[in-house]
Amino acid sequence: MKIKEINTRQELYCEFKKYGIGAEIGVCRGHNAMWLNQITKPKKLYLCDIWPEGDRMPRNRNPSIWRDDNEEIVKRIFEDEIKDGSVELHKNYGGHFLTELPDDTLDWVYLDANHNYEPTSLEINTAINKVKSGGFIAGHDYCTVPAAWRSGVIRAVNEQIQNGHILMEAITIESHPSFLCRVVK
């Protein structure tokens, strides 16, 4: 099977099921969530982040993005969707949030939270059960960054490909590429 090259992650989202059930793990200020919502038009979108408060900023590599109250920003962006129930916010770690969902709930999940190996591996391993067969696990930063997360995302994704649980379908050709894998059950 050929792996597609796709220009941007926004174009990658066109591969996701429209009007389905999706989740983004690692929402930050909600910029990417807006793209996911606009392109996929999900009937349900779960947005999950730890959204640190005050001095609880574990992301010391880029603390400037955590100066604002990002959770409140996301609540304002999705105010109407939260009211009508099509968007739910969850303040939790990605792997923990995913365990709360029933199996075979999601049509797709996009991972962009902690990029270290262990948490990314936990998120992918858990997502395999939560995403329907034929659905997608996708994520950002499928690359090495030695000073930060090293090869965490690549290792976690490639291990599940080797285990036969997911198949690589596409990768973006950006400096910090996104991956798209189909769940095989």
Can you describe what each PLM-predicted range is?
Residues 3, 7-185:
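S-adenosylmethionine/decaboxylated-SAM
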